[in-house]
Amino acid sequence: MTTKKLTKLLALYLPYILLGLVATNLGEAWRLAEGKELGEHIMSMMGTFPVAFANPLPSLHPLDLLIGFSCGTGLRLAVYLRSKNAKKYRHGMEYGSARWGNAKDIEPFMAPKFSDNIILTKTERLMMSNRPPDPKNARNKNVLVVGGSGSGKTRFWLKPNLLQCHSSYVVTDPKGSIVVECGNALLKNGYKLKILNTINFSKSMHYNPFAYVHSEKDILKLVTTLMTNTKGEGSGGDPFWEKSERLLLTALIAYLHYEAPAEEQNFATLLEMLNTMQVLEDDEEYQNPVDLLFEELAKKKPNSFAGRQYKLYKLAAGKTAKSILISCGARLAPFDIQELRDLTMYDELQLDTLGDKKTALFLIMSDTDSTFNFLISMVYTQLFNLLCDKADDMYGGKLPVHVRCLIDECANIGQIPNLEKLVATIRSREISACLVLQARSQLKAIYKDNADTIIGNMDSQIFLGGSEPTTLKDLSEMLGKETIDAFNTSDTRGNSPSYGTTFQKMGHELLSRDELAVLDGGKCILQLRGVRPFLSDKYDLTQHPNYKLTSDYDPKNTFDIEKYLNRKEKINPNDEFVVIDADSLPPA
């Protein structure tokens, strides 16, 4: 038994032990008293009390010890029976104990240094460390931000957290305004910036998903992401066609990965292969150029992954195969645009390096046209997988630099496959996901039954204001009820007039749905797992220490994307280069 448990037991039973010891002296007084009748015996005890208590030590006579033991045990039994049968009262909490959190509630979760925190509200923050002084205060860094249009999701939450500059950042940037306004601040804090622009391809770095394919598993993930986010509106029907497309795309991408040179591993080559796959319905023996490629592959590598997948696709009859090709062509139609082909020709983003040193990746997308948003989803899917694998394989399970994904307009980027599993596992790898939505129903529309799992893995949830009924209903229920005092008055008039007042207690929502709908524009509600909710002011961006480095403060700080992308890389004197003399190379 530990010392702590022993001390606790001693404190519990000490009063009864002391009473038992005192009762031994009472037993001695009773034993020394004379008298045959009970009354005479009791009267005689008055004279034996001084004798019995003359010695401060307890009596050790067997009869006295029995009386002492009986008194101590009897009192303990009486207390136990009373507590067991006692009525349970919760004074002031009869109908609910909900209340707003205060400074004392949030204090254990905040780091002393301002820059080592996630900014949640004006007065509440969450430490970045996954190992607080008290382990019970550990929380994951996933955040769910919900707010209607114009509620300040970007200004009051996303920008202040981006300016903290304590992690690498992946920022979904609708309209491309965030990088323009905050890019300069990040550069001055030593960040390397990377930009994928799906609005203006000429102001973007190149991104080639094929560059991150290293195994058959990666091929399947790439195909799944592509298929999931290029379904189109109202897609459904017979799953046969989708499964057939998956077979063909998997076969072609696998062939490019294992057989084609690196410069040909891209969507442009994939489209060229599809365009040469002519099918003649009335000639089953006809072989197109791709058929010949796979026939040659089967001779060299009979059990290749690409060959096995293509063999399954070729089981389709001519007319069916033609329909599959048409479906694949329609799915990859965006890549017929030359600018997009050029964008995905090679890779400059180096997604797997974001956890090595401080880097900010901005994913610029249109908030009105979702045509190219599937590229953003592909980036996130590959990013999560790459960083998790690198953390496990190279860094013992944790990245050197925490990577925070600030996913603004999360509902517009498409579906990230297995997001419900990722948000539950990325915490230990020093990765966090922050989902910014206009309403919770947006998440449910995309992820269906998995939406609740995703929300459940967000330890911090912030409501900035809105009027969507489902969001208001869920939030009001989660805030709970408090117990309030109410009184009724009655005034009876007539021949015998009377007046009365009745006081009673009742339950009332901490904030009802109608009160949430008219929440002050400067207020927000924070819910941190295991802590009372907070009704606080939104964080004022102008008070941030790095605000003066943004273009909001001074237009001179505006970040020029085109100028940054066209700059020449500065050569560091310590950089090492390998010089190859072309004349010394053997002839091809």
Model-predicted segments: where are they?
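Conserved long hydrophobic alpha-helices within structured protein cores
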Residues: 114-120, 374-382, 475
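General secondary-structure edge motif
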Residues: 98-100, 125, 141-142, 229, ...
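Short alpha-helix boundary/capping motifs
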Residues: 75, 356, 454-455, 486, ...
